[in-house]
A protein has these predicted regions:
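Extracellular carbohydrate-recognition regions
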Residues: 604-639, 767
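Extracellular polysaccharide-degrading/modifying enzymes targeting complex plant/algal/animal polysaccharides
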Residues: 36-297, 580-616
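Short carbohydrate-recognition loop motifs
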Residues: 641-665
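Extracellular beta-strand/beta-solenoid scaffold signature
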Residues: 117-119, 123-128, 263-270, 290-292, ...
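Right-handed parallel beta-helix
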Residues: 277-288, 300-313, 323-337, 345-359, ...
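Extracellular carbohydrate recognition and processing domains
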Residues: 707-735
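Extra-cytoplasmic beta-strand recognition segments
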Residues: 624-626, 670-694, 723-731, 756
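Alpha-helical segments with a strong preference for the paired helices of cellulosomal dockerin domains
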Residues: 922-931, 944-971, 975-1001
């Protein structure tokens, strides 16, 4: 019995031990170990403790076969290790092999750079040394040097392309064969640099050893490098591969032996062999890879996290495979692409990618300069990344990935025709709650005729379907906010609840540029968006057609908010050449004519973009008021007519402009000629009314050959009620004989114009981003923003309560300051003797300058403003430097009347407003220095030479001009009938007899 019992216990223990062994062997076949590497170590050590570390990456690579799941290979912080870490072993799920760090201090550096030593003088300031490694780039104190090049700076330009094989530049006058073997770095498209070796040079023709991707054309920039005879400028180097000699002309002509120099030689910092699984790369600084910082192909569950990767020639990280994670890394100063992710079901989260592809010609050949490239990834989540300063596109996306809570700032810094996010081959992609801003567009080395084409979100010309773009803030991009290229395969696109703000051409654009043929309709949904423009040149939305004269129905547009405080025309439709036409719509017209955006709204805020600080000329328009005739004005073509008429809503005479549609595609009404100067500013104002509603253009028309418009046209509206317009015009050409021109394109149009003024002025730009302020929360937590005591309004016009606003994560809010940015306003009533008619109680309008002065001697000027008083004598003037509750003298200056001051003691602003009326009582004027006409008090006329008195010198000026029958807008014309005559002389003579002078404190 005892024997049987013993056998039973023996059998029990056998099975128990077998189970334990089986469990341990399946859970962890070999116990994991930690290995240490330190600059103070030795490769003869066992590496398994901090006190017995290895010292080189070479040793780590040699031991790779011994590593097992769960092992940690740790590099000491603060140390630097040279070489390429080659990972060939896999871990297990939850038991990965980890390559990381230990200790304290800066991340350990795995560098692909060596420091060339033992430099000797080659010639002059050029040094040389033997260098046996293949190198790609040279750095001094962290700054990249140039490969010896021609020209030493700037660019040469192609004259014409020779298909895909080369180009011609007649300026290349070197002997045949001179450029053979050189490298040519050339821009071949807006979006592309290519790098090719010259196989043959002859008589200005450059032939490449292999074809470029993009056929070459006229006026693209290029330079040659990589020849020893080009080494003639500091900061350049040349590497002679056959002879293994490195030549260098150091910055400042310094001795390279005294400098910190790094030559990039290792192809990778970390290379994971194909098929490797379950490996973590963490807490390392990977630097100076000749190709990529981290490279992997077709592996599974590779994680790269908390690393810093810098100065790679091509990619910071490139991972292909399944289940990879790229998280919380800093990738910076990579010459081509920050991250390339061709992965399935991956995660790219929390990375900061800065300054990628910013050295022209040194990035990828034909395609590159990108922050994050993931257009071939599938099922990958891309979240909480920051892309700052990319040579080309910030993100390149496709398939069915999710990109949300990312910040993309400053893209297209080196190239053009791209944007913050570019998409291709989409089926299920979601772009949500990102902040995309400042796509620049660089045309420096592209043909001068090319346009800036920089976008927030850019649709490629590939199949795109089942796409969601929602909740994004897209701002300050130099061309278009969202560019929708409607190919024939575009399907099920949703653009919802985005904020598009201050994108320089249009907030959103729909085009059929890449369609194979006309398609009548698309099922895109565009709803709930804010399209906020900040310039009269910008529109909220544009529809463009290339393939038909009939517009496609680009989708369902509704419940959007359109705003442009500087232009009421917020939607544009264009038929592209050869049958070009363009029409801009106000929202009401868009709704009624097109039938879209029926529940959308338009902002009622309206602002000026400039404040006039000084008027530098008299009115250039010789007949601005049409009191008697339309002299000085002409019209064209034959179907157009102009006539002087009296319109009850305008001020006496006006000019009627009518066109029956005959003679041309539009009519013109043309003023007298006047000089304009490129870059100067001119204030234009006018009053208009129509018998019905319609549109008209205004522009400066040039007299110069091949120059038609002096700057872009402006489109305005005439209605059955009076509208007064004023704007600042900045010509882009100097012209001795510009004309103020209006035009109508719609036949049977008719409107009336009056009070046409054009003055040369000094201006101060009013910051439109402060008037309509965008508050962006770029964090993952709700943020509070102080309003700094400014009274803002919401977009619906309601007041913002309190001094703090709450903005949710990765979102934005636009608030409007319609309080003139707290600009004090003087509402002034004044009349000038010669211009005022007491019978009609109307005056001719004219320009007036007002100084606000200190009330204490010497009465210094505190601020000034310029305005035009209307036919009632009212002018509104904005000031910048005055405060409520402080008394100021009001000093009024008019071109041919005596300067006039407000009454003794001064006046003060209240709530930034001061109302002052010189016309009701003489006591409102300092020294009662006014003349009564009818029931009103007027400033004395006649101080033509502005010397402070109406006297003989003024009479002499008027008499001389009257004798020559002078006409036009002249200071001598005191009653403003455009004729200097006895009537003007009489006014001045009476005031001279009464010794009228300026009376001031």
């Amino acid at each position: 019995m005892a024997g049987k019992l013993f056998q039973s216990w023996k059998l029990y223990y056998f099975f128990l031990i077998s189970f334990v062994v089986f469990f341990i062997s399946t859970a962890n076949p070999v116990l994991s170990a930690d290995y240490y590497i330190s600059n103070d170590g030795s490769d003869g050590n066992n590496g398994t403790s901090i006190s017995t570390p290895w010292s080189t990456i070479t040793k780590v690579n040699s031991m790779m076969g011994a590593f097992t799941a769960g092992d940690k290979i740790l590099f000491r912080r603060g140390d630097t290790f040279f070489g390429q870490l080659t990972v060939s072993k896999s871990g297990l799920a939850g038991n990965e092999i980890i390559f990381g760090s230990y200790g304290t201090g800066e991340l350990p550096v795995i560098t692909g750079a060596k420091s060339p030593q033992n430099w000797i003088v080659h010639s002059g300031n050029i040094y040389k040394t033997t260098f046996t490694d293949t190198l790609s780039n040279l750095y001094v104190s962290g700054n990249i040097m140039n490969i010896a090049r021609f020209p030493n700076s700037g660019w040469l330009r192609t004259d014409f392309g020779i298909s895909n094989t080369g180009f011609n530049d007649a300026a290349l006058n070197q002997v045949n064969g001179y450029w053979n073997g050189a490298t040519c770095r050339i821009r071949t498209r807006d979006w592309s640099y290519e790098v090719k070796t010259v196989s043959n040079f002859s008589s200005g023709n450059v032939q490449f050893s292999s074809p470029v991707v993009n056929a070459l054309a006229f006026d693209y920039g290029y330079f040659f490098d990589n020849k020893l005879n080009l080494l003639d400028t500091e900061g350049e180097f040349f590497y002679d591969i056959p002879n293994q000699l490195l030549y260098f002309y150091a910055p400042g002509g310094a001795d390279p032996n005294t400098l910190e120099i790094q030559a990039t030689v290792s192809k990778f910092n970390v290379h994971l062999n194909p098929g490797v699984k379950f490996v973590i790369i963490e807490n390392l600084h990977l630097s100076h890879a000749r190709d990529k910082g981290v490279e992997e192909a077709n592996g599974t569950s590779i994680t790269v996290r908390n690393c810093r990767i810098s100065k790679s020639d091509k990619n910071g990280i490139r991972l292909y495979g399944t289940g990879h994670r790229i998280e919380n890394n800093i990738i910076e100063d990579v010459l081509d692409i920050g991250i390339t992710a061709q992965m399935f079901d991956g995660f790219i989260n929390g990375n900061t990618i800065k300054r990628t592809g910013l050295k022209p010609g040194y990035g990828g050949s034909s395609w590159g300069y990108i922050g994050l490239r993931a257009e071939s990834a599938t099922g990958t989540q891309i979240r909480y990344n920051i892309i700052d300063s990319s040579g080309y596109t910030g993100f390149r996306l496709g398939k069915n990935n999710i990109a949300e809570y990312n910040i993309i700032d400053y893209s297209c810094v080196i190239l053009n025709d791209g944007g913050g996010i570019a998409i291709d081959n989409v089926d299920g992609l979601q772009i949500k709650n990102n902040i995309i801003k400042n796509s620049i567009g660089n045309k420096e080395t592209a043909p001068a005729a090319n346009y800036n084409l920089s976008y927030g979100i850019y649709f490629g010309n590939t199949p795109i379907k089942n796409l969601i773009i929602s909740g994004n803030t897209i701002a300050h991009n130099r061309f278009v906010g969202i560019y929708v290229d409607n190919t024939n395969s575009l399907d099920n696109i949703q653009i919802r609840d985005n904020v598009l703000y201050n994108n320089f051409w249009t907030q959103i654009k729909f085009t059929d540029l890449s369609a194979s043929s006309y398609k009548s309709s698309y099922n895109t949904i565009c709803k709930g968006n804010i399209f906020y423009s900040l310039s009269w040149k910008q529109v909220g939305m544009e529809h463009q057609m290339f393939h038909s004269l009939t517009f496609s129905d680009y989708g369902n547009f509704d419940s959007n908010y359109y705003a442009n405080p500087y232009n009421e025309y917020i939607i544009r439709r264009m038929i592209m050449p050869p049958n070009y036409s363009s029409k801009e719509y106000r929202l009401a017209e868009w709704k009624s004519v097109i039938g879209e955006d029926l529940n959308s709204s338009f902002s009622q805020f309206s602002f000026d973009q400039y404040a006039v600080t000084d008027t530098l000329s008299s009115n250039y328009i010789t007949n601005p008021h049409f009191n008697d005739t339309i002299a000085g004005w002409t019209t064209w073509p034959s179907g157009s007519s102009i006539a002087r008429v009296v319109h009850p809503l305008l001020d006496g005479g006006s000019m009627r402009i009518r066109w029956n549609g005959i003679g041309f595609t539009e009519n013109l009404a043309i003023s007298n000629a006047f000089p304009t100067t490129k870059g100067s500013y001119y204030q234009v104002s006018m009053s208009v009314v129509g018998d019905q509603s319609g549109d008209f253009n205004v522009w400066g028309r040039s007299s110069l050959p091949q120059v038609y418009e002096m700057g872009l046209r402006r489109l305005y509206r005439f209605e059955t009620f009076r509208r007064d317009y004023s704007f600042i015009f900045k010509p882009d050409t100097t012209d001795p004989a510009t004309t103020f021109t209006t035009g109508m394109k719609l036949p049977d149009s008719l409107f009336y114009v009056d009070n046409v003024h054009m003055y040369k002025v000094d201006v101060q730009k009013i910051d439109s981003t402060e008037k309509s302020k965008l508050f962006i929360n770029e964090t993952s937590s709700p943020q509070l923003f102080s309003l700094n005591g400014i009274s803002y309004k919401n977009l619906d016009g309601s007041n913002v309560n309190g001094n703090v606003i709450h903005v949710p994560p990765f979102s934005s809010m636009i608030l409007v300051n319609d309080g003139e940015i707290l600009t004090p306003v003087l509402n002034l009533n004044m009349l000038v003797e010669g211009m005022y008619d007491p019978n009609s109680q109307q005056t001719v309008s004219d320009t007036v300058r007002v100084y606000l002065r200190n009330i204490n001697s010497p009465f210094q000027i505190v601020d000034s403003a310029v305005s035009v008083f209307n036919t009632s004598g009212f002018a509104s003037l904005d000031f910048q430097n005055v405060s409520d509750g402080i008394n100021y003298y009001i000093h009024v200056i008019h071109r041919n009347s005596t300067d006039t001051w407000s009454n003794s003691g001064g006046e003060s602003f209240s709530s930034s407003v001061l109302n002052y009326d010189f016309t009701n009582d003489s006591s409102m004027t300092y020294g009662n220095n006014v003349i009564r006409k009818g029931t009103k008090f007027c400033f004395y006329s006649g101080d033509v030479d502005k010397d402070g008195a109406v006297d003989l010198s003024d009479l002499s000026v008027i008499d001389n001009l009257a004798s020559s029958f002078a006409v036009g807008y002249l200071n001598s014309d005191l009653n403003y009938d455009l004729l200097t005559d006895i009537a003007d002389l009489t006014i001045a003579d009476n005031n001279a007899f009464n010794v009228v002078t300026v009376i001031s404190p």
